[in-house]
């Protein structure tokens, strides 16, 4: 007989409302009908309780539940004994833990809701692991005995003796202004324990923000401020939860270099990051996490950087002979329309323009674009990419220059703030009534973006990633000639980013429309772009938007400004950053090839 499957039953605390339904799950359960207590609901209980030992995995309760609050997941039985933590009955559980090593940077890669932040909390000593015994949590002696013989035993012993101090840079930096008040300089002075504040501020471009109040900072400035506050404190464990969101490509690399400058033979550094090219640059070794989001997560053993990211993209763990995703994610050079189609396409032109906003001046060099083409705009924050998008959309009038062609425009802004009250379904019905039921749109956009799973939730209660997926669906669902999409990858995890890129690409090709996209995630930008528009000049002062160039020429120009070179991975063609002053880096800079399309 094959391994006996162990099941975990997950009850969603927000959705399960036994007082508002007829308890269909209990009435329809065959095990309950046989007289065993498999599903229990008392008049006092806030949510149902499902016995995982009695459950036979028939899945009837899942289909009958009116609130879609239940899910039953089969687990490979070899994981039964390796539970590290479980929040409560019928809730998420985490198996194993990543093993940090002193003097090296550990990168964690995995989708959202798979236990990365839980693992960070446990390793920081902020959450006591209960080894799955949520009703009778073990004491530390038992926990240390459990980890006996692994590197984690010494690690937890040190944490218990208060030898290790841990600092976490939180994932959601937009919450910081609620907790910290006052000028940036004052807070940095108060936290500065290592006296490295000046060099860290120079590295992260924070010097000119010292007099500004924390509540007045933009997303990218908050992110750099949060990284700086962590870097200038004295600690033994540094943890960074998504240090690159809101930052542009140049700032991402500066943040990565700053984090790597903390390396010291006695320090542990752990980074969770969804931008794979930054994670690749930052880490010395990698642990992948796989499983079912918000049901269970499993941490793999440590791999080298290249192997770890390739395992995640491939969806197969060779050491455990286990496939955790049906498809592997490969980066061929973007699929483009063939030559014959290009001749049939319409050409649109936009003129040279100039726009003054206060002290900021943006000059736009005239250019043209065709149907079925994706233009990616590359440039630092503050070079006028969003201004250009708004001028194309007709929201801003140019001060000098000709008229922009009048086109129907669909626009997804950078910051998404949900204004509508009601469910996602009502919002889709109101905004894109014809599209969201159209079979082609459902298969091209709705299914891959997993809108079905959140369609009956309140818009106000959605997380950042869910909001982003809804916003992208609304943008693509609107009939338009030009789609303007500002940062489609914000808040999405690495897997969703690649799905979103594929959805946008396929939709634009099928609909024979044009898209202008601003994107800082390098892997996503290379996958999406047919041509690129490079922005150069002095950010927030005087910048130029060049006319569209081919992917290779544009990337070379952009990367030469940043002084970074890329190579391609031979297995799945993803772009990888060369380490500063490595042989390959020096060679490519000499020959002027900052970016390779194929090796």
Summary of predicted features, one role per range:
Residues 226-227, 255, 471-472, 500:
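Hydrophobic anchor residue at the start of the ABC signature
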Residues 213, 242-243, 250, 485-488, ...:
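Walker B catalytic motif
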Residues 101-111, 117-193, 275-306, 368-438, ...:
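ABC ATPase nucleotide-binding domain signature region
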Residues 84-89, 95, 133-219, 233, ...:
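ABC-family P-loop ATPase nucleotide-binding domains
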Residues 252-265, 497-511:
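Helical segment within the ABC ATPase nucleotide-binding domain
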Residues 106-109, 299-367, 371, 544-599:
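ABC ATPase nucleotide-binding domains
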Residues 266-272, 512-518:
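Conserved H-loop
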Residues 22-44, 49, 60-77:
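Iron-sulfur cluster-binding cysteine motifs and their immediate structural context
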